[in-house]
Amino acid sequence: MNRSRQVTCVAWVRCGVAKETPDKVELSKEEVKRLIAEAKEKLQEEGGSDEQETGNPSEDGMQSARTQARPREPLEDGDPEDDRTLDDDELAEYDLDKYDEEGDPDAETLGESLLGLTVYGSNDQDPYVTLKDTEQYEREDFLIKPSDNLIVCGRAEQDQCNLEVHVYNQEEDSFYVHHDILLSAYPLSVEWLNFDPSPDDSTGNYIAVGNMTPVIEVWDLDIVDSLEPVFTLGSKLSKKKKKKGKKNSSADGHTDAVLDLSWNKLVRNVLASASADNTVILWDMSLGKPAASLAVHTDKVQTLQFHPFEAQTLISGSYDKSVALYDCRSPEESHRMWRFSGQIERVTWNHFSPCHFLASTDDGFVYNLDARSDKPIFTLNAHNDEISGLDLSSQIKGCLVTASADKYVKIWDILGDRPSLVHSRDMKMGVLFCSSCCPDLPFIYAFGGQKEGLRVWDISTVSSVNEAFGRRERLVLGNARTSSISGPFGNRSSETPMES
């Protein structure tokens, strides 16, 4: 598959979160040497020290380079005269034979006419220059306004993988790449979080990245040109350990790729990760270590999400065609399972109906479930292929958007538990890998796929969407409730929406 413009995962950052003027990294020679040394050490630890034949440049190639770089030699005396000079006819045609003659004395008055001109120090000071130069535009684009959203996407290029940080501003109709971050491995999932592990208990603007390795990287979005993450969770197994068959313990982290991430907004130091090693790990980011490892699935865990209002409640979906619901205070004893017709691709909580969640499968179905019941509320045959995007509008109740490997995005009205198709569109992006709704703008969605990079679509521009949802009340979620927490998860004294 061509990787030239693949976008594999995407996440939004709310307005007003990012630093207005991001910091730029300026490394000293000593820091560069340290980073190079650490990179070499990691390669050696992973058993990647096998030398590759690079070869020296061939003498013919070096000779060719020298030939191209050699200055042109003067022509020999025996060369014909017309190869070195223009003939008289050409001189006459362009009046070049009089080029060195002094000009008309009347032309000296031109200098007098310039005496009245005003010279400005820069174009900013000249009132007649209304067009801004490139540097001014670059300076303005570098600043992040309070009305700007950030969109962070994982991108797989032909020869490298990176994070792209885009700026989106609906009011100004602007959308551009602000900066990018070079990644060490193929990105599979991204999750925004504001937890800062530093002792001062401040908040930050971070993005956690799951990739084809067991290591989760956490990057600071307020720093441009950074070469290493702020911190990492987990570690890679060296080739020597893999050959010995030594399995990494849950105390160290995952042993395979990290397929999905979910940050707990109520217990801010907790991050959940789903892995191809069949486990879910709850990370205590304040310690940089796993707090718990959940092993209830029998195949790769592809998706998971914390409940938006209940800190201890988590759902996960797996290749084993099941969804698990956990109480993270005692996950092994307190969990519930549902079985489905296909592998689970995505799960998401319905933030308008806290007892309900949605699950999508690789055979094109969407299931709406009540966490207190065994049977689904409805089953929707939504697509002809796996459903990789499953996103409820951030503010419009009943507005569901699905994205699929069948190349289509579909918009559904599921209000009243009777789903109806509102609009369907071929995005011309090939296989669709991911989607996400803007937290501040309920009709703005971002999509990533096999080609055409990152796409942002305002679905309200579709007349049928306007008819279905245009007059529907917008429900803005308030701040989540918090309570004092003694450990990774604390007992909550108040009654929870998940309780019947």
Curated annotation (Swiss-Prot):
Compartments in which it is found: Nucleus; Nucleus, Nucleolus; Chromosome
Changes after translation: Phosphorylated.
Gene3D superfamilies attached to this UniProt entry: YVTN repeat-like/Quinoprotein amine dehydrogenase
WD repeat start-end pairs: 185-229, 253-293, 296-336, 382-422, 427-467
UniProt keyword annotation of Nucleus present: yes
Residue list for modification Phosphoserine: 49, 58, 484, 493
One of the GO BP terms on file: rRNA processing
A GO CC term attached to the entry: nucleolus
Region (Disordered): 38-88
PROSITE patterns, sorted: WD_REPEATS_1, WD_REPEATS_2, WD_REPEATS_REGION
SMART domains in UniProt: WD40
Positions carrying Phosphothreonine: 21, 54, 85
Main function: Chromatin-associated factor that regulates transcription. Regulates Pol I-mediated rRNA biogenesis and, probably, Pol III-mediated transcription. Regulates the epigenetic status of rDNA.
Protein family membership: Belongs to the WD repeat PWP1 family.
Name of this chain's protein: Periodic tryptophan protein 1 homolog
Species of the source: Bos taurus
Gene field: PWP1
